[in-house]
Structure formats: C-alpha cells, structure tokens
UniProtKB/Swiss-Prot annotation:
PROSITE patterns: HD (PS51831). The lineage of its organism: Bacteria, Pseudomonadati, Pseudomonadota, Betaproteobacteria, Burkholderiales. NCBIfam families: dGTP_triPase (TIGR01353), PRK01286.1-1 (NF002326). This is Deoxyguanosinetriphosphate triphosphohydrolase-like protein. It comes from the Bacteria. GO terms for molecular function: dGTPase activity. Keywords: Hydrolase.
Amino acid sequence: MNDRFDLPSAPFDLEGPLAPYAAHSAQTRGRVHAEPPSTSRTEFQRDRDRIIHSTAFRRLEYKTQVFVNHEGDLFRTRLTHSLEVAQIARSIARSLRLNEDLVEAVSLAHDLGHTPFGHAGQDALNDCMKPYGGFEHNLQSLLVVDRLEERYGGFDGLNLTFETREGILKHCSRNNAATLGDLGRRFLEGQQPSLEAQLANLADEVAYNNHDIDDGLRSGLITLEQLEDVPLWAIHRREAEAAFPAVSGRRLINETIRRIINALIVDLIGTTRAGIAEFAPQCIDDVRAAPALVAFSEPMHEEARVLKRFLFDNLYRHYLVMRMSAKARRIIDDLFRVFMDDPRLLPPQYQAKSNPDEQPRWIAHYIAGMTDRYAIKEHRRIFAVDAV
C-alpha cells in the first residue's frame, strides 16, 4: 500500500474563503530572511507555530497580569491571557472573513515582551532605562521575535512575516518608528495596520477587562456590590438572573461575564461590518489608507471606558495590589542597578553580549525575560545574606 501523497507547493487554499480586504498569506510582504515556502502550512500558520514553540511563549506561564504568580493558582497569567485573546480574536475573524491564522499569531505574540510583575514591572524597567532610550513592551515583543529568540541556525529571532510583526507592534514612538524601516512607516505616515492586527488589539481589551473582573472577585479585592455601579456589569447581571433565577454565586458571576464578552463581541462585529461597508476596502492597501475599521460603537466604547475606570480605581489601585507593585518595582530597580554597577554579576551569556555601549539594553533584555518567580529568586540570590 502506498501511503505517499502529493502536497501542493503553496497551500494558500488552507485559508478558506477570505474577504478581499483580509491579509492573504499568498500576498505577504515576506520575511527578513528568505525561506522556501512550506508544502503543508501557510506563512501565517508557520508564524503561529514558531511563536508557540518559542522560549518566550513558555515563560508567559509564569508572568502575571495583576497578581504575583504564586498568590493563587486560579489567577490569570500572561499565557492564559494570550490564549483567551487568541480565542476571542479568532472567533471574530471568522465572522468577518479575516485571516484566522494571522490574527491568532498576533494574539499569541502580543505579550512576549512583557516584564515580570505586569505593568508595575514595565513601569519600573522603563524608569531605569529612561537615560538609555526607555523600555516599551510592544517594542520588546518585536525584539523578542526579531532578535532575542535563539532557535534557528540561519538567523536570530523567529523570522516572522511582516504582517505578524506589524500586528505585534501596536504602539511605537516616532523616534523608534524611524529606525524600523517599512515596519515603522505607518506610525510616521498615519496609516493603519491590517484588520487582523486591529482585531487582535481590541480582542486584548475585551479579554483583560472581563478577566480582571473575574480575578478581582476571586481575590476579594472588588465586590459584587461595587460592580453594580458599572452599567455594563449591572445590565448583564440582571439578564443572567432573569434567565437563570435559581443560579447564584460563582456560576452567576461566570454567566454575567460570559454575557458581557458576548455583548462586546457582537457590538464589535456589527460596528466593524458597518465601517467596512462604508469605506468598501477592496484590498489590504485600502485598509491601510482608511481610518481604523475594527471598532466598538460609541455607546459600547463609553460603557467599556467606565468599566476600565472602575478597574483602575478599585482593583489596580487597591492597596494590596499597590503593595505587590511596590515590591515588584523594588526588585526590578535593585536588579537593574546592581547589574549596571557590576556586570560581572550577570549570567555569562549576557556578559559576553554586553559591551559598554549596549550594556543597559542587554540588562533590560535579561530582566524583561525573567518570570515573576525567577526575578524574586534572582533578587534573593544577590541581596539575601543567607542565599547562595
């Protein structure tokens, strides 16, 4: 019996019936280092697979959103968050006939450059790096996939397609954009990225707002009574109670969050379809020249803004979270300063890479790549008298 079969040389039919304004793998702007095409996967599938197998992606399991990793087993990490973003984005992409593989790749990679300890860690590292160009996690995510991953013999990084790299770089200063060639041009010329990149950005917002509600309630740092002041919560909590009168507690919370996520997704799809109908893009170049087309309606945008404000005031600024953030900032600041004062304390591979001019940036790379637990242990090893 002959089990061999012929595969197509360019498997772009695997993408299905995409809209003309979607990003098509056959029309990719390519990779920095030329590679032969796969006979079994599209270019964006290859990007997704490379991201999943990267060291930086595995480390996301031990990097936090809001809570320090060891504070609770049920709290979300950067890894679970990235998976949730990818699921939301991929579902919306299918409804809009966008490229599911590209939107998944961008979603999975968008947090690869995040520091340990969430935003507190990023703010601390940025403060340390201000004399040396600053630190920004979106640009760091790009550096991870372009340079810092070491998986291939022929090049540094993952050698991802232009479209995936573009989606990872959500924000960029004009100064940094000027150094990035074609990738930075849209920030200088006021153009938009692909619809897939726009979608991944808003799916990130949908995921973290709603899942921070969940984690905040689990931790006891916010209460159901407080949430009643948030219209988006109150409306869908009442709907959930009306639909399931016998349900209460954790199940009612889950049902309410599910309904909020669904409402946001339905609104986003409807608003985006209306924008596409109005501007009628016929190709991805038309998308780049149009205003942002993936969007919430104004009423939903306002409701989401109120929710974000609530989380900022009641969760992210809760005194226990602020204590964790203060500890995180101290750890990051201490590590950066001790490595700057004596680079011999760095692991050998970072000493070898770190000439005097590049030393601050490589120290930032080292710290940004740490997990929460590793950063705590490294701090203890260096500063605790009884540690070895």
